[in-house]
């Protein structure tokens, strides 16, 4: 649960402006947008699968930290005023029987055709990146204006009912002398994935080539930097693929919803 803290009106305006820009057709990764405001992942599944997914998220809180649940027919979240989850992500992925069949920038027609969908909004590691930057730790994909690299790991999630799959991890290259600070900062924010799940040695996670992510873009890793891996909110999409859920809608990896909640509200 987030702390109810005072929000700078300028930050609220920036978050609303970002949502309106996205609603109007902005179609790029959202890292660095409305800096300091929480961003979230999303997965919508049929009502018949919703309990299984809720249990899956409960059993795997580091990769699937649920920040809000929207019942069928509800498209506004308590996390943001004037919001519509059908239009306020830059890009959506449409899934049938575990296969991605389409990507769209406006999902209203699809939600209208599937009125039984229950939506889960999941914490996102973009929400601790401002804190990293304020500590003097460069966030490479923001600096380079690329998408964060994400990988399907060999870490098995705890199954629930019909749902199972492996954890997806995001990666940020961190100078070796700053890793302890990065761990300390992110560990205080478990609702947005918390501390890293792995440091260095990507092959230990089943990653054959760190320069070829499964989602997003590759990041430069400079001399003296170590790849650091965090649990990622794309994990539900891996579960959709593995479990062959009949129908689902998700955000496209890196294309998030921007809320009215400041990042610092999640600091424990």
Swiss-Prot record:
It comes from the Bacteria. Keywords: Lyase. Its EC number is 4.2.1.-. SUPFAM superfamilies: PSTPO5379-like. One of its GO terms (molecular function) is lyase activity. Belongs to the D-glutamate cyclase family. This is Putative hydro-lyase A1S_1268.
């Amino acid at each position: 649960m987030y702390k109810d803290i005072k929000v700078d009106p300028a930050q609220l305006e920036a978050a609303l402006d970002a949502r309106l820009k996205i609603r109007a057709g902005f179609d790029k990764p959202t890292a660095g947008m409305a800096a300091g405001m929480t961003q979230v992942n999303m997965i919508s599944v049929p009502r018949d699968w919703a309990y299984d997914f809720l249990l899956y998220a409960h059993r795997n809180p580091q990769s699937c930290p649920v920040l809000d649940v929207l019942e069928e027919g509800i498209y506004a979240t308590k996390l943001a005023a004037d919001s519509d989850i059908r239009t306020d992500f830059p890009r959506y992925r449409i899934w049938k029987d575990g296969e991605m069949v389409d990507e769209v920038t406006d999902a209203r027609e699809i939600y209208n055709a599937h009125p039984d969908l229950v939506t889960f909004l999941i914490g996102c590691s973009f929400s601790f990146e401002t804190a990293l930057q304020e500590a003097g730790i460069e966030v490479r994909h923001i600096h380079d204006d690329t998408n964060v690299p994400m990988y399907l790991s060999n870490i098995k999630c705890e199954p629930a009912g019909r749902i199972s799959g492996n954890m997806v991890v995001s990666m940020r290259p961190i100078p070796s002398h700053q890793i302890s600070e990065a761990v300390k900062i992110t560990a205080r924010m478990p609702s947005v994935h918390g501390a890293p799940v792995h440091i260095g040695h990507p092959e230990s996670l089943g990653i054959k080539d760190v320069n070829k992510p499964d989602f997003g873009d590759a990041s430069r890793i400079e001399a003296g930097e170590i790849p650091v891996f965090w649990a990622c909110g794309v994990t539900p999409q891996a579960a959709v693929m593995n479990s062959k859920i009949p129908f689902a809608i998700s955000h496209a990896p890196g294309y998030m919803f921007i809320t009215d909640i400041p990042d610092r509200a999640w600091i424990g």
